[in-house]
């Protein structure tokens, strides 16, 4: 990207309006330009025919619409798409589209790698490099919308839902994520309703409080354990923000909208968090919480110490929660044949921590000493 030019994908509508006014342009031009970029999907200013030649020339000199580069695209047997996107810095992130009969969900990344270290997630083993810019986040939506349209020659609105559940912890990139979600919900851009944009967090309490004040999007919490002792192992940020704080906030998160509920995500790990006593503990934990629970069959990745719970175990767990009035569903595994399922996204990360090197060392050890059983704790790879 030309360092002298501003990338317009970093601007929401109001910011774009202010930018054009600073360039001595009429405010109404912002709406036209915003729609060209996001609704029509045009990057070439020369093709924005209702802007006027003088403005088009000015935009060509001062601005650009720079996107991540698609370096690979895979399509699963079930129709799931996964794109590997190269950033200007050389790192790569992944974006996934999951088609269903009446909806299409785009799973969007927020960081290069992840700043957290959940023990059951492949992204965490890649380490962390940096936060994504607003342009790199909304650029995933822009690219997916164009790719899906171009592939079958239609211009139907295929992306009906966006989930901030890709690589990274969204709330540790608060400003850029909120800015991108605002563009997603803008009627001049992608026009998604607040109930169709979901942010998933591991429980960064201060930023959850901020999000509640400034954004109406749906909230999902990566819970995965019903006690602090177990969650400390699976989701280490729990040591800083324990369940008592997390559940207290979730109880009042949608207090002004009593019909809305917090979704609690719970990965099913064989013999770890899937036993009847865990279900009983979860029922007690979520008492009086406006909640729905999403059970996620574990999706394996190299060197993981975990296994997926059996279908019978998952069904029994779900049924027990349902009998106690907790709305519970089991997420259908999609895209696992191309490593696009929940917890499998990895990308290509130039790790600025030592986490990926430690993980690779452990992987090498497991290959060279098959006689030694390798047990990995979250502390060892933090």
Curated annotation (Swiss-Prot):
**Pfam family for this entry, one:** Radical_SAM
- Signal peptide positions are none
Annotated Radical SAM core domain ranges read: 100-336
Task: List the GO cellular component terms.
Answer: cytoplasm
Give the record's cofactor note, including how many are bound.
Binds 1 [4Fe-4S] cluster. The cluster is coordinated with 3 cysteines and an exchangeable S-adenosyl-L-methionine.
Q: SUPFAM superfamilies, from UniProt?
A: Radical SAM enzymes (SSF102114)
* The reaction(s) this protein catalyses: adenosine(2503) in 23S rRNA + 2 reduced [2Fe-2S]-[ferredoxin] + 2 S-adenosyl-L-methionine = 2-methyladenosine(2503) in 23S rRNA + 5'-deoxyadenosine + L-methionine + 2 oxidized [2Fe-2S]-[ferredoxin] + S-adenosyl-L-homocysteine; adenosine(37) in tRNA + 2 reduced [2Fe-2S]-[ferredoxin] + 2 S-adenosyl-L-methionine = 2-methyladenosine(37) in tRNA + 5'-deoxyadenosine + L-methionine + 2 oxidized [2Fe-2S]-[ferredoxin] + S-adenosyl-L-homocysteine
Q: Which GO terms describe its molecular function?
A: 4 iron, 4 sulfur cluster binding; metal ion binding; rRNA (adenine(2503)-C2-)-methyltransferase activity; rRNA binding; tRNA (adenine(37)-C2)-methyltransferase activity; tRNA binding
The disulfides recorded in the entry are 107-342
- List, from the UniProt record, the residues annotated as the active site of this protein: 94 (proton acceptor), 342 (s-methylcysteine intermediate)
> Which coenzyme or cofactor does it need?
[4Fe-4S] cluster
Q: What is its main location?
A: cytoplasm
What keywords appear on the UniProt entry?
4Fe-4S, Cytoplasm, Disulfide bond, Iron, Iron-sulfur, Metal-binding, Methyltransferase, rRNA processing, S-adenosyl-L-methionine, Transferase, tRNA processing
Gene Ontology biological process terms from the UniProt entry:
rRNA base methylation; tRNA methylation
Q: What does this protein do?
A: Specifically methylates position 2 of adenine 2503 in 23S rRNA and position 2 of adenine 37 in tRNAs. m2A2503 modification seems to play a crucial role in the proofreading step occurring at the peptidyl transferase center and thus would serve to optimize ribosomal fidelity.
Name of the molecule in the record: Dual-specificity RNA methyltransferase RlmN
């Amino acid at each position: 990207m030309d360092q002298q030019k501003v990338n317009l994908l970093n601007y929401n509508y109001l910011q774009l309006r202010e930018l054009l006014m600073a360039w001595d342009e009429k405010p109404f031009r912002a709406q036209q330009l915003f729609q060209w970029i996001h609704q029509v999907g045009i990057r070439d200013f020369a093709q924005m025919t209702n802007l006027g030649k003088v403005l088009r020339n000015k935009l060509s000199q001062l601005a650009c619409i720079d996107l991540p580069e698609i370096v690979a695209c895979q399509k699963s047997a079930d129709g799931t798409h996964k794109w590997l996107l190269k950033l200007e810095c050389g790192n790569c992130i992944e974006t996934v589209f999951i088609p269903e009969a009446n909806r299409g969900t785009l799973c969007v990344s927020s960081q290069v790698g992840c700043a957290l270290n959940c023990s059951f997630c492949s992204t965490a083993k890649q380490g962390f490099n940096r936060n994504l810019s607003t342009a790199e986040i909304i650029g995933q939506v822009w690219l997916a919308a164009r790719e899906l349209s171009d592939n079958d020659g239609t211009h139907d609105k295929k992306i009906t839902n966006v989930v901030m559940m890709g690589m990274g912890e969204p709330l540790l990139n608060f400003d850029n994520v909120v800015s991108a979600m605002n563009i997603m919900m803008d009627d001049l851009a992608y026009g998604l309703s607040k109930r169709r944009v979901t942010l998933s967090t591991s429980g960064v309490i201060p930023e959850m409080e901020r999000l509640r004040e400034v954004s109406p999007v749906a909230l999902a919490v990566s819970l995965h354990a019903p006690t602090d002792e177990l969650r400390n192992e699976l989701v280490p940020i729990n040591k800083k923000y324990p369940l008592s704080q997390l559940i207290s906030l979730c109880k009042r998160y949608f207090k002004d909208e009593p019909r809305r509920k917090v979704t609690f995500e719970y990965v099913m790990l064989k013999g770890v968090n899937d036993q009847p006593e865990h279900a009983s503990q979860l029922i007690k934990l979520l008492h009086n919480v406006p909640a729905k629970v999403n059970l996620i069959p574990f999706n394996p990745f190299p060197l993981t110490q975990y296994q997926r719970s059996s279908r019978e175990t998952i069904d029994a767990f779900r049924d027990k929660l349902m009998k106690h009035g907790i709305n519970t569903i089991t997420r259908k595994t999609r895209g696992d044949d191309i490593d696009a399922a929940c917890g499998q996204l990895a990308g290509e990360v130039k790790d600025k921590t030592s986490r990926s090197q430690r993980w690779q060392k452990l992987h090498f050890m497991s290959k060279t000493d098959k006689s030694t059983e390798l047990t990995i704790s979250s502390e060892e790879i933090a």
